[in-house]
């Protein structure tokens, strides 16, 4: 691996940990806050230095458009697309009716053509975020969350789950006797789900985020 300065190594390690923990990289603002930079612009300078050294790649215009390169065991990595390959066509899921599959045709409002470089792993669909319960994870009302269908998730990953008639986005943590779905906003309460609860179903994990104007 290319030799990095101590500060560059800190930034690189932070990106790697974020991908391992949640499935997608941090924003510039999150890097600045975590490492004590004066502004997101300082984080951007370090990211560009890492890109010049060939250890990450930046996707222009995407707040989380960061990929780790050249690391055999890099978490949640995928093969980089060759120039000219078709973009991903992802269904955008709107409101989900109770009891029906999340990708049922009536839930799909439209399809988006997306650059695969925006995501840490190939998503199956986009889910429009409603509310601010995940604000402190950088996920805001109206954002499009890229979701990969899964029936299992690791502790700390951001998931999409059914709770009764609702679909929610939360951070997953296993607890004695069940699961805790953690909100990333102190104004919202965490949700405890008892083991074996029939009201809970894991729909997938977050693998990227698109903010309005990035498509």
Curated annotation (Swiss-Prot):
Role of this protein: Represses a number of genes involved in the response to DNA damage (SOS response), including recA and lexA. In the presence of single-stranded DNA, RecA interacts with LexA causing an autocatalytic cleavage which disrupts the DNA-binding part of LexA, leading to derepression of the SOS regulon and eventually DNA repair.
InterPro entries in alphabetical order: LexA (IPR006200), LexA-like (IPR039418), LexA/Signal_pep-like_sf (IPR036286), LexA_DNA-bd_dom (IPR006199), LexA_repressor (IPR050077), Peptidase_S24_LexA (IPR006197), Peptidase_S24_S26A/B/C (IPR015927), WH-like_DNA-bd_sf (IPR036388)
GO BP field: DNA repair; DNA replication; negative regulation of DNA-templated transcription; proteolysis; SOS response
Site-annotated residues for Cleavage: 98-99
EC supergroup of this enzyme: hydrolase
Catalytic activity: Hydrolysis of Ala-|-Gly bond in repressor LexA
Pfam families, A to Z: LexA_DNA_bind (PF01726), Peptidase_S24 (PF00717)
EC code(s) of this entry: 3.4.21.88
Top-level taxon in the UniProt lineage: Bacteria
GO molecular function, one term: DNA binding
Swiss-Prot/TrEMBL keywords: Autocatalytic cleavage, DNA damage, DNA repair, DNA replication, DNA-binding, Hydrolase, Repressor, SOS response, Transcription, Transcription regulation
Similarity-based family: Belongs to the peptidase S24 family.
Summary of subunit composition and partner proteins: Homodimer.
DNA-binding region in chain numbering: 28-48
NCBIfam families in the record: lexA
Location of the active site: 133 (for autocatalytic cleavage activity), 170 (for autocatalytic cleavage activity)
Species of provenance: Burkholderia cenocepacia (strain HI2424)
Entry-linked Gene3D superfamilies: Umud Fragment, subunit A, Winged helix-like DNA-binding domain superfamily/Winged helix DNA-binding domain
Protein name listed in UniProt: LexA repressor
């Amino acid at each position: 691996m290319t030799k990095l300065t101590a500060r560059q190594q800190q930034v690189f390690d932070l990106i790697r940990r974020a991908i391992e923990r949640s499935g997608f990289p941090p924003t510039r603002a999150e890097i600045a806050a975590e490492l004590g930079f004066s502004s997101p612009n300082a984080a951007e300078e370090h990211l560009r230095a890492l890109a010049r050294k060939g250890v990450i790649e930046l996707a222009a215009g995407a707040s989380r458009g960061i990929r780790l390169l050249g690391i055999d065991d890099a978490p949640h990595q995928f093969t980089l697309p060759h120039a000219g390959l078709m973009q991903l066509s992802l269904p955008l899921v709107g409101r989900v009716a109770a009891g029906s599959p999340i990708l049922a045709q009536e839930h799909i409002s439209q399809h988006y053509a997306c650059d695969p470089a925006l995501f840490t792993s190939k998503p199956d669909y986009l889910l429009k975020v409603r509310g601010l319960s995940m604000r402190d994870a950088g996920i805001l009302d109206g954002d499009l969350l890229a979701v990969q269908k899964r029936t299992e998730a690791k502790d700390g990953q951001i998931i999409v789950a059914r709770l009764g008639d609702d679909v929610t986005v939360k951070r997953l943590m296993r607890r004695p006797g069940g699961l805790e779905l953690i909100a990333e906003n102190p104004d919202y309460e965490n949700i405890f789900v008892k083991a074996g609860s029939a009201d809970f179903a894991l729909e997938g994990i977050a693998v990227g985020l698109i903010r309005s104007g990035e498509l």
